[in-house]
């Protein structure tokens, strides 16, 4: 996201302001799979990463060492954004977030507090998906003679009937070897790159032809989801 922000600024875009929410701390199991070092152990993940990105790129992004509000009554104006990105292994948090986003009244698209898009990342050990959906029922698109525009994209909760899924908490991993049994080494970073590429196309070109993808890292196959 920091590279995306830097590239956008380089082509005249005002850039991004990002707030990261995470209540977890860095453990030994995170070293190697993610960009954490042994000196980061014990630090809050959000604060650690945002501080590093701010120092490296000169940004003023915000870190919140807590979970995202679980209900609209607990959310403040600064909890809302035009694009919400989730990378969670918890089904309930997805459902809670969707209930919040769809309950926020759409005032105007130019307000940074109006939820417009929700991008969700999910994965198993070596497979995963990225889905970019629209929060409002419709987002008005400009008239085009070249393309057939689409005003609505399905969010992840409309793809998957999470209410029917029985969630089992796998618990925290105590070592890198144990963590790799649950998530392969490059599945998270590969999905992150591909998801950011969708956002890059959207910002850079003002349009996207694919709003998601399915990835199988063991077979090196990827299936894009066309608009």
Regions found by a protein language model. Name each.
Residues 6, 88-227:
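Glycine-rich phosphate/adenylate-binding loop
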Residues 82-83, 117:
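Structural motif
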Residues 11-13, 21, 88, 122:
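N-terminal Rossmann-like NAD(P) cofactor-binding subdomain of oxidoreductases
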Residues 2-17:
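Conserved S-adenosyl-L-methionine
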């Amino acid at each position: 996201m920091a590279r995306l922000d830097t590239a956008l600024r380089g082509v005249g875009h005002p850039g991004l302001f990002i707030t990261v929410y995470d209540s977890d701390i860095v453990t030994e199991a995170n070293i190697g799979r993610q960009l954490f070092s042994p000196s980061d152990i014990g630090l809050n993940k959000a604060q650690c990463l945002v501080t590093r990105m701010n120092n490296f790129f000169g940004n003023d992004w915000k870190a919140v060492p807590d979970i995202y509000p679980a209900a609209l009554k607990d959310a403040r104006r600064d909890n809302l954004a035009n694009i919400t990105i989730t990378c969670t292994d918890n089904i309930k948090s997805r459902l809670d977030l969707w209930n919040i986003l769809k309950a926020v009244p759409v005032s105007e698209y130019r307000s940074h507090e109006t939820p417009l898009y929700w991008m969700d990342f999910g994965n198993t050990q070596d497979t995963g998906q990225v889905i970019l959906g629209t929060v409002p029922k419709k987002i008005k698109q400009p008239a085009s003679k070249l393309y057939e525009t689409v005003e609505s994209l399905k969010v992840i909760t409309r793809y998957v009937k999470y209410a029917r899924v029985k969630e089992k908490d796998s618990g925290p991993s105590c070592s890198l070897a144990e963590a790799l049994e649950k998530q392969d080494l490059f599945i998270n970073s590969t999905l992150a790159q591909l998801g950011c590429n969708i956002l890059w196309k959207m910002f850079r070109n003002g349009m996207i032809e694919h709003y998601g993808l399915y990835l199988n890292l063991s077979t090196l196959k990827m299936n894009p989801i066309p608009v």
